[in-house]
A protein has these predicted regions:
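Short active-site oxyanion
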Residues: 1-2, 95-101
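Conserved acetyl-CoA-binding loop-helix of GNAT-fold acetyltransferases
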Residues: 78-93, 103
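A short, internal acetyl-CoA/4′-phosphopantetheine-binding micro-motif in the GNAT/acyltransferase core
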Residues: 70-77, 106-107
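Helix-loop element at the rim of GNAT/NAT acetyltransferase active sites that forms part
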Residues: 16-29
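C-terminal "cap" of GNAT-fold acetyltransferases
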Residues: 124-174
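A short beta-loop-alpha structural element at the N-terminal edge
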Residues: 2-14
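Conserved active-site alpha-helix within GNAT-family acetyltransferase domains
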Residues: 99, 105-131
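A conserved beta-strand-loop-helix scaffold within acyl/acetyltransferase catalytic domains
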Residues: 29-42, 46-47, 53-70
């Protein structure tokens, strides 16, 4: 198995993989345009020349990033592909000296084995204000928030909503 940075040529396969699980409501959908726009966020797993998994590490602030769009081809499951992808995300986050990474997930046992811990959604204000405000599940989110502290004893920078340009917030200021 090879874990490598995604290229633009991988976008359609990444989209198909994510859509497979999104159609079953096991993860949020990602428009193809979003995948192209964020292709540098993605790592892919390849076995015998076939893309069998993907995971994105999306930077959400100077000290945090989200593991998102983790998907493994069901035919290639149970081979450690998801683990290898998230470990690549963790390594990249450490290279960038991030304090914390997080995921919103349905597979808490998987992330717990990698050292993530469950936290309240309310403890993730950047995620809520930057992404969740645009999600159809905003008021009924059933995903579990989990974090992995990368630097022991160091907390992420406190959140100040005035630093984020969110249409609803900006309209309230008028």
């Amino acid at each position: 198995m090879e874990i490598r940075r995604a290229t633009v040529a991988d976008a359609l396969q990444i989209h198909a993989l994510i859509s497979h699980f999104a159609n079953q409501e096991l993860m949020l959908p990602r428009p193809l345009l979003s995948i192209y726009e964020n292709i540098r966020d993605f790592q892919v797993a390849v076995i015998d020349g076939r893309l069998v998994g993907c995971s994105g590490l999306h930077f959400t602030w100077g000290d945090m990033a989200e593991v998102r769009s983790l998907a493994v081809d069901p035919e290639a499951g149970r081979r450690g592909i998801g683990r290898a992808l998230v470990e690549a995300n963790i390594a990249e986050a450490r290279e960038h000296e991030l304090v914390q990474i997080y995921a919103f997930t349905y597979v808490t046992d998987f992330f717990a084995k990698l050292g993530f811990r469950v936290v309240a959604h309310e403890s993730m204000p950047r995620k809520v204000w930057m992404d969740c405000v645009n999600c159809h599940k905003l008021n009924c989110c059933d995903e579990v928030a989990m974090v992995l502290d990368l630097i022991e004893g160091v907390e992420p920078e406190p959140f100040d909503v005035s630093q984020v340009r969110v249409p609803i917030v900006n309209s309230l200021k008028r």
